[in-house]
Amino acid sequence: MSKPSRHRFEQVFANLKIAVEAAGGVMADIVKLNYFLAAEVDQADVPKMRPIRDRYLDVAKPPASTFVAVSRLMRPGWLIEIEAVAAIDD
């Protein structure tokens, strides 16, 4: 995995952690992840993303997840987008 891709994937998870915690939750509250990968992402790099993901999520009980390859994302230059669903107690 190229350094820019690794850095971007790391940044996406760091941002996700900030968002979940701002909502009063923790990363273990995430029950579903949808990964959207732009066509520029080498599909051979997808398995290499797992160690980064594993630093943020409970590897013993990971959330359900789906990977979707798309022609492009909302903004030029975006390569990875993650949609998360979390079950956060009040």
Task: Identify the meaning behind each predicted range.
Residues 1-90:
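Short, polar/acidic, helix-capping and beta-turn segments at strand->helix junctions
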